[in-house]
Curated annotation (Swiss-Prot):
It is a multi-pass membrane protein. Its EC number is 1.14.14.17. Its main location: membrane. The lineage of its organism: Eukaryota, Viridiplantae, Streptophyta, Embryophyta, Tracheophyta. It comes from Arabidopsis thaliana (Mouse-ear cress). Pathway: Terpene metabolism; lanosterol biosynthesis; lanosterol from farnesyl diphosphate: step 2/3. This is Squalene epoxidase 5. InterPro entries: FAD-dep_OxRdtase, FAD/NAD-bd_sf, Squalene_epoxidase, Squalene_monox. Catalyzes the stereospecific oxidation of squalene to (S)-2,3-epoxysqualene, and is considered to be a rate-limiting enzyme in steroid biosynthesis. GO terms for cellular component: membrane. One of its GO terms (biological process) is sterol biosynthetic process. Expressed in seedlings, leaves, stems and inflorescences. Detected in siliques. The gene is SQE5.
Amino acid sequence: MAFTNVCLWTLLAFMLTWTVFYVTNRGKKATQLADAVVEEREDGATDVIIVGAGVGGSALAYALAKDGRRVHVIERDLREPERIMGEFMQPGGRLMLSKLGLEDCLEGIDAQKATGMTVYKDGKEAVASFPVDNNNFPFDPSARSFHNGRFVQRLRQKASSLPNVRLEEGTVKSLIEEKGVIKGVTYKNSAGEETTALAPLTVVCDGCYSNLRRSLNDNNAEVLSYQVGFISKNCQLEEPEKLKLIMSKPSFTMLYQISSTDVRCVFEVLPNNIPSISNGEMATFVKNTIAPQVPLKLRKIFLKGIDEGEHIKAMPTKKMTATLSEKKGVILLGDAFNMRHPAIASGMMVLLSDILILRRLLQPLSNLGNAQKISQVIKSFYDIRKPMSATVNTLGNAFSQVLVASTDEAKEAMRQGCYDYLSSGGFRTSGMMALLGGMNPRPISLIYHLCAITLSSIGHLLSPFPSPLRIWHSLRLFGLAMKMLVPHLKAEGVSQMLFPVNAAAYSKSYMAATAL
């Protein structure tokens, strides 16, 4: 019995000694870590690493640097990019840009003013303009179209002009991770040397082809179609302030002025039948299939780029629901985080909105090294962004589906109903254009207009009298509309889509006239 007591007391003494040692040692480590953070601040260490210096990376670098953060931006290629997307800034995007102090980046690049669009279908045309009497939108209700590369270079120049921004050309190979926390990146610099960069916060903003996303979550992008584009040079559209949307086959065609002398021509092809660009099949397809559907007054300009041998580029259109990473110390942004069909040209607008939100949430934090607080910021960011992102994601993906031509009577009725709705004028046109332009980021308003288009299309389908076949097609049309909407209700969240309180809070914080 005595031996047993001795063993128990010995074990208890050992446990107490170990506990005291553990707590003391842990306290020392915490103190050392805090001292290291202070030392890093004193030594001019980086606060934030941004992977990618496109629109998002450059804008975020500028915003965070203006708040006193020391930012290291690593971009694979600092030459002026050539893209066929990211060339149209909606009114809502311009508002976000101005709130970030970057509106002047649209100056000096020959950007063109756009006040709406002209829609063409089956020989008819209708003008749909951004509403000028929207009292809830505190900014000039016009868009801008431009060469994407020129805009990106202006953003890079503006960001790198700040002394606490380091813009470096390099290829990021991987993220540095310790116990579920991202500490920085490993990258190859312009000299070909592999090196590391460390910071308490890493932002991955490297676009739709992100090679870092798969190490943060298992989110995969779905390819929807391909957008094919080229430039017709030394010409100007009739009414250049209106984007031209042609409801052609197999899908839509667009023309818009991206400089005083250049017109972007772009059309969509479905993924199961893409003509080859390299062997000339695509140019033949443009001349024989797409061009005859372009209105005569636009056709000469449309064909000019092909006839002059301008380079044709094709880009996949993708969609991907936003998903948070479980790893700490890292944030995904832009197309690396969330994608939708680019039919409504609103990707940059969502991205700039995200940057505004993230900047505001980070401003109260004096030290970004607290991974727990950063995780809370990211969760809040994910919820706050929903009114804008859910509206744009749902509208972009739904609108692109409606624009695809079909021999199916129900689908074609929906397509015709969309054209009729946009061309009807009044609150229908102004309401839809406010949504398209990011002037009214309210999911419930979008649902209202989608339901109105559906009911209008059903009414058109049932006239002049509801035969059994027409009733059947109407039911199918309603089913198609639900297939467009329900997946987004699930993906974005029913409460975020249906309850207006979140949208009201977003509008008050991020759509007001006052700067952030």
